[in-house]
Design a protein with these regions (language model features):
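Small-aliphatic-rich amphipathic alpha-helix that forms the alpha element of a beta-alpha
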Residues: 31-35, 76, 98, 109-164
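A generic local secondary-structure boundary/capping motif
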Residues: 64-67, 140, 164-167
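Short, well-ordered secondary-structure micro-motifs
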Residues: 60, 87-90, 163, 186-190
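Mobile, glycine-enriched helix-loop/loop "lid" segments at the mouths of ligand-binding/catalytic clefts
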Residues: 93-108
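A glycine-rich helix N-cap at a beta->alpha junction
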Residues: 68-83, 167-188
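N-terminal amphipathic, basic helical "cap/leader" segment at the start of enzyme domains
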Residues: 1-95, 201
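Short Asp/Glu-rich motifs
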Residues: 52, 162-163, 170
């Protein structure tokens, strides 16, 4: 699919067919999603794939009962890590090895990244959400390329989600993304596309 067609074709789908999404497809989508850009290439995202019926019901509880969480065969919880330096060793070693930086530049960059650990938590939440949202958007395009529908969701109780799924400290739930094959009569697929503000504005 041409990229323009892909962008214009993607919809936020709320009604899903009663069809499973196989592990191979999910992994292929995730492999492409992680090519998204991120601050310093630190890739702070993590993905929790929620597919078991009982677990989707638990997730629906913390998502204010929204039906698409259990209608879709899979919902991804997209997390951002609050520790900016979690992957700094591998990231900088790779950049030195491939010629993007010399050792001195890598050392200076490491110092800057490690200093970010001292930022207030609210600032680190904003930092991780920015990069993680880019990966989530890439994920939705990768899914659509394969005929898989998605819907990003910001409506959920983050604290309740962390408690319900025993999420370790340092992981911020950024969004949910439902994923599956759209129902044949899904309004989001059959009706004309919703209004978009013109670029001229």
């Amino acid at each position: 699919m041409e990229f323009t067609d892909l962008v214009e074709d993607r919809r936020s789908v709320h009604d899903y067919a009663d069809a499973d999404l196989d592990r191979e497809t999910i992994e292929a989508i995730l492999r492409e999603a992680v090519y998204a850009p991120s601050s310093y290439n630190l890739q702070p995202w993590e993905f929790l794939v929620v597919g078991e019926d009982a677990n989707r019901e638990r997730l629906q509880e913390v998502a204010y009962g929204q039906p698409q969480v259990t209608d879709a065969p899979v919902t991804l919880v997209v997390f951002g890590r609050l520790d900016p330096a979690a992957h700094v060793d591998r990231v900088l070693a790779d950049q030195v090895e491939k010629g993007y930086r010399d050792e001195a530049s890598a050392a200076a960059t490491r110092e800057s990244i490690e200093a970010m650990r001292e930022y207030p938590e609210a600032e680190r939440r904003v930092w991780t959400a920015k990069s993680t949202a880019l990966a989530a958007m890439s994920l939705m395009f990768a899914a659509r390329e394969r005929g898989v529908a998605t819907c990003p969701m910001g409506g959920f109780d983050a604290e309740a989600l962390v408690e319900e799924f025993a999420v370790p400290d340092g992981y911020e739930p950024v969004m949910l993304v439902t994923m599956g094959y759209a129902a044949e009569d899904a309004d989001d697929e059959t009706l004309p596309r919703k209004f978009r503000r013109p670029v001229e504005e």
